[in-house]
Design a protein with these regions (language model features):
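Non-catalytic structural scaffold of enzyme domains
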Residues: 1-207
């Protein structure tokens, strides 16, 4: 199966390719939509028609060479209706947003760490589809995305953003789990797990 890995930047595209390879899918095409996090956030701020038109042009250029599209970017999949495009192109399109529609059923209170407001809104909306009574504590961290893009060691990033204090706050509330609402964030998942007993949810493993 030939899979196009579409993501916001070259970094999360690479992370998506690595995730697929770990699960036995080796025939991939890398399709980063932007060169860096700021450029991607700017793209997400365009009018809906402009965003969709650009994504269509990308899909049109490769649709005869692929069997599926793996959208490994929360915020991108929250601002483009890939469900509609999947039906139109008759091409499987897997996105993180689809995973959140079942995740919300299992919890009453979640913390969501997202890259920007676009991603956070998309995650929240899809969680609420499954559970309208769910409580969500949302945090947006574009600066964390930028730090990960530099390839800085995980432990340095954890200290830079003082995640110890953030997770201490989470522990003082009734938050049941922390959702990594950005596909960059699994980069620091191992270090985050050492800070607390609160479960870390990475929807990428379910995609």
């Amino acid at each position: 199966m030939r899979i196009a890995v579409m993501a916001g930047t070259p970094m999360d595209t690479k992370l998506g390719v690595n995730l697929l390879k770990e699960n036995g899918f080796t025939q991939t095409i890398s399709v980063p939509i932007s060169n860096n996090p700021v450029e991607q956030t700017t793209f997400q701020s365009l009018e809906e028609e402009e965003r969709e038109q650009y994504i269509r042009s990308v899909i049109d250029g490769m649709k005869n060479e692929i069997d599926a599209v793996f959208v490994y970017c929360n915020s991108l999949s929250s601002v483009v209706n890939f469900d509609k495009l999947e039906e139109e192109y008759k091409l499987p399109m897997i996105t993180p947003m689809q995973m959140y529609r079942t995740l919300g059923v299992e919890h009453d209170y979640l913390a969501v760490m997202a890259a920007n407001s676009h991603g956070l809104t998309g995650v929240e909306n899809n969680l609420y589809i499954a559970n309208p009574n769910l409580k969500v504590f949302g945090v947006t961290m574009l600066e964390l995305v930028k730090a990960i893009e530099t390839g800085k060691p995980q432990e340095e990033i954890i200290k830079q953003f003082d995640f110890q204090s953030l997770f201490h706050y989470f522990e003082s509330t009734e938050i049941e789990a922390v959702v990594l609402g950005c596909t960059h964030f699994p980069y620091v998942k191992t270090e985050l797990q050492q800070l607390s007993n609160i479960p870390i949810i990475d929807v990428g493993v379910y995609m």
